[in-house]
Curated annotation (Swiss-Prot):
Its main location: cytoplasm. It is found in: Cytoplasm; Cytoplasmic vesicle, COPII-coated vesicle membrane; Endoplasmic reticulum membrane; Golgi apparatus membrane. Transmembrane segments: none annotated. The COPII coat is composed of at least 5 proteins: the SEC23/24 complex, the SEC13/31 complex, and the protein SAR1. Golgi apparatus membrane; Peripheral membrane protein; Cytoplasmic side. InterPro entries: ADF-H/Gelsolin-like_dom_sf (IPR029006), Gelsolin-like_dom (IPR007123), Gelsolin-like_dom_sf (IPR036180), Sec23/24_helical_dom (IPR006900), Sec23/24_helical_dom_sf (IPR036175), Sec23/24_trunk_dom (IPR006896), Sec23_24_beta_S (IPR012990), SEC23_SEC24_subfamily (IPR050550). This is Protein transport protein SEC24-1.
């Protein structure tokens, strides 16, 4: 046992373009639109609008004309069931004339996975934008993978960073070299700058071709930032773990589970520069700090460095002595660890200097492992139910106030002691009323707002892992992450006796801890003259009108910035450049630059034809989340409905009025035909749907929508449904690319469910396996090794492993493929649900559980009328009625 001191009141070498297909997906988009065009009439598309010229050695000759995306109107009522394959299509192509690019190539414009605009043709005037009622914003994802080594972005390390003297934008593929190449004209503000000395030379002074430079060829690239981009030496990555050791956390197994998970992942913490540091604070009604000494073998190796070996015999003698001492190593190390209790929560203080309590992982790893093994034993018999989170947060901030870092809170108890103490809010009579947002989704204590301001000053991020069967006030606690660049993860009903609960928690915490991070990051968007970023959505601290600050920048979040047109755009193209200054765990200061070029237009038809329905969905979602948190749930729902209604009305007025069928149909362009479906589904999402939704669940869902990368957000709004009982022979097996082939999805409606069928539903957070109540014994045997549906396990459980059943193997392959990801920490638990059957045995307890699960599944079938929300057909009819008034 440790001493208890009481009394203290190389990156992967693949260019990103290879990982981010562009041309093939644009061709896919063209083919999809062509199918619609053929159905509507003999429309023709120009191939040049949908592909770039192959990379050239020298700048191309000016293009003589500009080709725009074509608009194809559709009647939404003839598009039933909706063609959900559109949800997997890339956005409408961005048509940039070749003469506006220094060296045209597939990497000249930013891939949409990094920066995605709601409009791929920008109105030249604010009045035209208002006429269309379409929103203008960009979805930003600075990193695409949890580990930086999985993503190659070109790096300039020659110290030459070329920026415009007027607007401070960075040199990019869309500038113009003028005056025999001695100067360059900024594409953002049109200012003429001098080309710096050394621009056409390498580090050795040898001449190079400037058209081969990264900033000329690539719209996504990085600079190694010189010293003037830093205000101090790069800090080490520092993690402070606040562990809940109250009775509830011990009883449900969270303490033991989290301690073991942290122990197993100490080696996985980002530690590229060998400077990563760790501290642990255990919290109940007091604060328990730990002094962790250097590992014995580190001390011995230090001594050995100062000594010369006399001969091999002496070495052998020393090794024998070390072996004799090995039996005592565990006891000696554990005894050297000391715990200090601080019970004065009004003014929590550090019992030792912070450098004694925050220890280098490199030199203390073994002792940290000893400590993490011991902590569950020390508190296993506790009867203390209190949890002083507020004082613990203040103490953790004292520990790392000089370096910044991450505070990882793992808790199972509502904070009820000291500053920031919370109480259970009365939900009865408030849920599903106009008071829901103000009384249940607001921050209960101002401490959680003011503390994040201090965190931003000290470069500290707070992540929350809340796992409990009790009320946790996620709405209040999520403020800690929302404004510090972190995330709140919620595990309702967690209990370590459930293997599935433990699996999900440990998988997600492990991926979170191993995820690369950036420190002391700031992000800014610069736009062409006339464009300005005005609203910002995501988890960060908005330090000024256009500067977003991240104490640490994670790899699994995205952000959305609204863009306003403040002056008319006179040029044929406009530009948005996202620059992020950050410090990597390697100790390097980097600047990541992403430049997006967009055509401008005076045609409303072109604006509609180039609108991105998925990015628009994200835009409306972020604004609805803000409404729900800052106003009311009704105002959030009204925003969703009105946003779509305005777009449909404007489209009818500006585009469809010449069509005689405009009154009897509901028209929209083909590239936006999924938008009504997504808005109908968004209103049924747990974050927004009316009904008695527990506030913790509502707050957690709103929090997740704020940061979810776009493809996961779309799946959480419109779940992917697979029919499994009739999959083709090749599905569930490896294809020619050694990837497991997934079945084609079907529409999310119960009308397609057969009573004997087997279906898998993926909502990005969970997986649901629906077993039809009349499933045949052969199917049940192949999947579950039973021919009686009553014996099929229901609830949270994995499929049995039946190696003698090829069908079972294929289904498990499909589930594994869906869970396979390297861009999110989410691990999707599998829930098995039996459909109703006339032979279902009467069991009141089982019936209640089954009814709850069936209701949950029905909420994912978003094309149906569910939970007092209109079906998709009814929704379209209501929209048609509204715009024809």
């Amino acid at each position: 046992m440790f001493h208890h001191r009481g009394g203290c009141t190389p990156r992967a070498q693949t260019p990103y373009a290879a990982n981010v297909p562009i041309v093939a997906e644009q061709q896919q988009f063209q083919q999809q639109i062509d199918q619609t065009a053929n159905a509507m009439g003999n429309f023709q598309l120009n191939d040049n609008a949908y592909s770039f010229t192959q990379p050239a050695q020298q700048p191309q000759q000016p293009s003589s004309r500009k080709v725009a995306n074509q608009l194809y109107p559709v009647d939404l009522f003839t598009e039933l069931p909706p063609p959900i394959r559109d949800l997997s299509l890339p956005p409408p192509p961005i048509t940039i004339s070749q003469d506006s690019i220094v060296t045209p190539s597939e990497t000249s414009n930013v891939p949409y996975q990094y920066v995605r605009s709601t409009l791929n043709a920008v109105p030249k005037t604010s009045s035209l934008l208002k006429k269309t009622k379409l929103p203008f914003g960009i979805v930003i994802r600075p990193y695409l993978n949890l580990q930086d080594s999985s993503e190659y972005v070109p790096l300039n390390n020659d110290g030459i960073i070329v920026r415009c003297r007027r607007c401070r934008s960075y040199l990019n593929p869309f500038v113009a070299f003028i005056e025999q190449g001695r100067r360059w004209q900024c594409n953002i503000c049109r200012f003429k700058n001098d080309v710096p000395f050394g621009f056409d030379q390498n580090l050795q002074g040898a001449p190079i071709n400037r058209y081969e430079r990264n900033e000329i060829k690539h719209s996504v690239m990085e600079y190694l930032a010189p010293i003037e981009y830093s205000v101090r030496e790069p800090p080490p990555s520092t993690y402070v773990f606040i562990l809940d050791v109250s009775q509830n956390a011990v009883r449900n197994g969270l303490l033991a589970t989290s301690a073991r998970t942290i122990l197993e992942n100490l080696e996985s913490l980002p530690n590229h520069d060998g400077r990563t540091s760790v501290s642990i604070i255990c919290v109940d009604h007091a604060l328990h700090y730990f002094y962790v000494p250097l590992d014995d073998d580190y001390e011995e190796s230090d001594d050995d460095d100062d000594e010369d070996d006399d001969d091999e015999e002496e070495d052998n003698e020393e090794e024998e002595e070390e072996e004799e001492d090995e039996e005592d190593d565990d006891d000696s190390i554990t005894e050297a660890i000391q715990m200090f209790d601080v019970g004065d929560l009004s003014e929590p203080f550090l019992p030792m200097p912070s450098e004694e309590l925050v220890v280098p992982l490199r030199y203390c790893k073994k002792n940290l492992e000893k400590l993490l093994k011991t902590i569950p034993e020390v508190f296993q018999d506790t009867h203390i139910s209190k949890f002083a989170l507020g004082p613990a947060l203040k103490a953790a901030s004292y520990l790392i106030s000089n370096t910044g870092g991450k505070i990882e809170v793992i808790s199972s108890t509502l904070p009820d002691t000291g500053v920031g103490k919370l109480k259970r809010r009365a939900e009865q009579g408030v849920l599903n009323t106009t008071k829901e947002s103000s009384q249940l989704l607001s921050c209960q204590d101002s401490f959680y707002k003011t503390f994040t301001i201090e965190c931003s000053k000290m470069q500290i991020t707070v992540d929350m892992f809340l796992a409990s069967e009790e009320y946790m006030d996620v709405a209040t606690l999520s403020h800690l992450s929302r404004f510090s660049g972190g995330q709140t993860h919620f595990y309702p009903g967690f209990n370590a006796t459930s293997l599935n609960d433990v699996t999900k928690f440990t998988r997600e915490l492990s991926k979170h801890l191993s995820m690369d991070i950036s420190m002391e990051a700031v992000m800014r968007v610069r736009g062409s003259t006339g464009l300005r970023a005005t609203s910002f959505f995501g988890h960060f601290f908005n330090r000024s009108s256009d500067l977003c600050a991240f104490s640490t920048m994670p790899r699994d979040q995205s952000y959305l910035f609204e863009i306003s047109i403040e002056d008319s755009l006179v040029a044929e193209h406009c530009y948005l450049q996202v620059s992020t200054l950050l410090t990597l765990n390697t100790g390097e200061r980097r600047i990541r630059v992403m430049t997006l070029a967009l055509p401008t237009t005076e045609s409303g038809r072109e604006v509609y034809a180039s609108a991105d329905q998925l990015a628009i969905t994200d835009f409306i979602t972020q604004n609805a989340v803000a409404k729900a948190l800052n106003s009311s749930m009704d105002s959030a729902r009204d925003l969703i409905t009105k946003s779509l209604q305005d777009i449909l009305s404007a489209y009818k007025k500006e585009i469809s009025m010449s069509n005689i069928t405009a009154v009897t149909s509901l028209n929209l362009c083909a590239n936006l035909r999924m938008l009504p479906l997504l808005m109908n589904a968004l209103g049924k999402h747990i974050a927004f749907r009316p009904g008695m939704v527990p506030s913790d669940y509502r707050a957690s869902s709103l929090n997740k929508l704020e940061t979810e990368p776009l493809h996961y957000l779309i799946k959480s709004i419109y779940p992917t449904v697979y029919s499994l009982h009739d999959i083709p022979d090749e599905v569930g097996l490896l294809d020619s690319n050694r990837e497991t082939k997934l079945p084609d999805p079907i529409n999310a409606t119960a009308s397609l469910f057969e009573r004997y069928g087997l279906y898998l539903i993926d909502n990005s957070t969970e997986l649901f396996l629906w077993v039809g109540g009349d499933a045949v014994p052969e199917l049940l045997n192949d999947v579950f090794n039973t021919d009686n549906i009553s014996n099929v396990p229901v609830g949270k459980s994995e499929l049995p492993v039946l190696i003698d059943s090829p069908f079972n193997v294929r289904l498990r392959n499909i589930i594994s493929k869906i869970r396979e990801n390297n861009d999110t920490i989410t691990f999707q638990s599998l829930y098995t649900i039996r459909g109703p059957s006339i032979n279902e045995p009467a069991n009141l307890t089982a019936e209640r559980e089954m009814a709850s699960l069936r209701l949950w599944v029905s909420s994912t079938l978003v094309e149906d009328k569910i939970l007092n929300c209109a079906s998709y057909r009814e929704y379209l009819q209501s929209m048609k009625t509204a715009i024809n008034r």
